[in-house]
Design a protein with these regions (language model features):
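Conserved phosphate-donor
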Residues: 1-18
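Phosphate-handling active-site elements
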Residues: 15, 40-54
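Flexible, gly/pro- and Lys/Arg-enriched active-site loops
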Residues: 19, 167-173, 213-236
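Short, small-residue alpha-helix embedded
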Residues: 26-46
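Glycine-rich beta-strand-to-loop/alpha-helix junction loops that act as flexible
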Residues: 29-30, 208, 245-251, 267-273
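Charged C-terminal helix
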Residues: 48-86, 295
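Conserved N-terminal beta1-alpha1 strand-loop-helix module at the mouth
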Residues: 75-172, 177-204, 231, 241-244, ...
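Histidine/lysine/aspartate-rich catalytic loop segments that bind and position anionic ligands
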Residues: 192-222
């Protein structure tokens, strides 16, 4: 098949981890895998996540020498440097009359947001790249993650931190082949079946929604509500699926704590922040609710 799957069996659960099947088999890479897992455990990753990242490492290691002979290339930055569980607020850009996207991003970053997704559905490629260059610089200055919505090619050209893929966009396995294992790849989900598919496709996080009606999307999937989130998160726990999950879609401020109580690890916001006159202050207020563990300041 197209996927190579490893399994972790513990007294409490069985976890499956899949990556795109490489040209060559994994025979002889056991020492590499065990060393990688041990390294991720040392960094504080839970065992299932350490195994998943170790599998990523081995997959990149195998691909570092296409002949499968002699020395393999040194593997550097084979996984995103930021633990996404510790960045539970994501801002998704949208058009706002009188306030440019770079101005929006500057405001939310000043308020403490450390994850921005550039979403410009109505813009052409040239405008997205031009805006993306400015947004990337703002994110770098504030130590924030910079992801591009939908377009893998643009994410590659901008050297973004990653890409978020909708259900009808490129397969995450193909995006991983193009972007590499050091980039963040997120995927949209509306059902538990979607989550299983994305998990098998080795996304780094899931955008789960919509929570309720939202004006930022023209084609809306079925609304989940708190009950929908609870059912999906319960199923994830039962099946041993460990991924950061961000709720998205029409979230209001008084929805945040009930949503987090379902087991969702974060939220993605657009209108709630964008429509506030003081975006920086509103961002700070939301972050205080989320009790975010702040990222270290950017180097240099």
């Amino acid at each position: 098949g197209a996927l190579a799957t490893d399994r972790l069996i513990t007294p409490d659960n069985t976890y499956s981890f899949s990556v795109a099947r490489a040209k060559h088999g994994k025979h002889g890479t056991g020492c590499v895998l065990s060393s990688a897992i041990a390294s991720y455990l040392t960094l504080g990753y839970p065992l299932p996540d350490a195994c998943r990242q170790g599998q990523h490492y081995v997959a990149g290691f195998i691909r570092s020498n296409d002949t499968n002979l002699g020395m393999h290339n040194r593997m550097e930055n084979t996984t995103p440097e930021v633990d996404l569980y510790h960045v539970p607020l994501q801002y998704i850009t949208d058009h706002k009359e009188g306030v440019s996207i770079p101005e929006q991003v500057e405001a939310v970053c000043k308020g403490g947001c450390r994850w921005v997704q550039l979403r410009m559905k109505e813009a052409d490629r040239e405008e997205i790249i031009r805006t993306g260059c400015v947004v990337k610089e703002i994110c770098r200055r504030h130590g924030a993650l910079f992801l591009v919505n939908d377009n893998v090619d643009i994410a590659l050209e901008l050297d973004a931190d990653g890409v978020h893929l909708g259900k009808e966009d490129m397969n995450p396995l193909e995006a991983r082949r193009i972007l590499g294992y050091s980039k963040i790849i997120g995927g949209t989900c509306n059902t538990f079946e979607d989550v299983v598919d994305r998990f098998r496709q080795q996304v780094d996080y899931i955008g789960l929604g919509p929570f309720t009606y939202t004006t930022t999307k023209k084609r809306l999937s079925p609304i989940l509500g708190l009950e929908g989130y609870q059912k999906i998160m319960d199923a994830c726990r039962k099946e041993g699926i460990h991924l950061p999950v961000h709720a998205i879609g029409g979230i209001r401020e008084n929805d945040i704590q009930p949503i987090l109580n379902t087991g969702v690890t974060g939220i993605a916001l657009s209108s709630l922040l964008k429509n506030n006159k003081d975006m920086a202050r509103k961002t700070k207020d939301i972050i205080e609710q989320l009790k975010i563990k702040e990222l270290p300041p950017p180097s240099g």
